[in-house]
Amino acid sequence: MTSPPFLGESQTLSKVLTRIEAEPARVYTDESGGIIAINPAFSYLCGYTFDEVKGKKPGAFLQGPVTTQESLAPLRAAIQTRTSCMTEVLNYHKDQSIYRVQIELHPWKDDASTLKGFMAIERKLP
């Protein structure tokens, strides 16, 4: 079986998927929390495409009944104080399966130190 032409000769689909799976998922939001960008690892982790999540707040579709308010408290505090944090959360995949994820949240600012939004780095945990 040959690789699709866009992969090049040195890469196979399995190598690309392995690399995506190993990469942390990244989500970028504007200052109001709406998603403005994701990376391929985010789609791989949770099953959603950018078109499905654009403009939505991550909690609107990733959190559910087993997601505890306790685990979300550090995220809320960091957003309010415009600081960084790390926490572990139970999230929901598009197919509604539950997975545990470590989330690092960081504010991103322009050259004048004006808040532009947040970047979340997510790593799936066993």
Question: For each predicted feature, which ranges?
Answer:
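PAS-family sensory modules
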Residues: 1-32, 74, 104, 109, ...
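PAS/PAS-like sensory domains
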Residues: 22-23, 78-88
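PAS/PAS-like sensory domains across diverse signaling proteins
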Residues: 32-34, 44
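PAS/PAS-like sensory domain cap-loop motif
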Residues: 42-53
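PAS-family sensory/regulatory domains
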Residues: 52-66
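PAS/Per-ARNT-Sim sensory domains
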Residues: 64-77
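Beta-strand residues that line the small-molecule/cofactor-binding core
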Residues: 84, 98-100, 117
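PAS-family sensory domains
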Residues: 90-96, 109-110
